[in-house]
């Protein structure tokens, strides 16, 4: 289902354990390209976290308290389902290395083929 308005939305998924300056920079770059950035904190109960989920959520919300175009949510399940739920046109990702790029490229191709969402 398309968005109800002409607003462009991107999701930025991750565990954000911890949320770093690099993550903050990616969100700010996303705001230059999209009307809204939804940060999705993935809740993977099988992974051991350094910081509790509630603490990560609160820290990220505080970091963007000045920016009404950023929303922060916790989600479970597939990232692509989270993107579809929010009518996102794109998934925002950061790449740190060649290995990251290869992994992200494969995921991006699957997202595009299965759901038509760019990464």
Kindly label every feature range from the protein language model.
Residues 2-119:
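Nucleotidyltransferase catalytic core that binds NTPs
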């Amino acid at each position: 289902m398309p968005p109800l308005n002409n607003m462009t939305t991107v999701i930025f998924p991750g565990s954000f354990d911890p949320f770093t300056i690099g993550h903050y920079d990616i969100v700010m770059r996303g705001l230059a390209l999209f009307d809204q950035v939804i940060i999705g904190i993935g809740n993977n109960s099988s992974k051991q976290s350094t910081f509790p989920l509630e603490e990560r959520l609160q820290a990220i919300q505080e970091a963007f308290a000045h920016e009404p175009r950023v929303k922060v949510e916790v989600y479970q399940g597939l990232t692509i389902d989270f993107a579809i739920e929010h009518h996102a046109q794109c998934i925002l990702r950061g790449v740190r290395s060649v290995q990251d790029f290869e992994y992200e490229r494969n995921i991006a191709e699957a997202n595009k083929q299965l759901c038509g969402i760019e990464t």
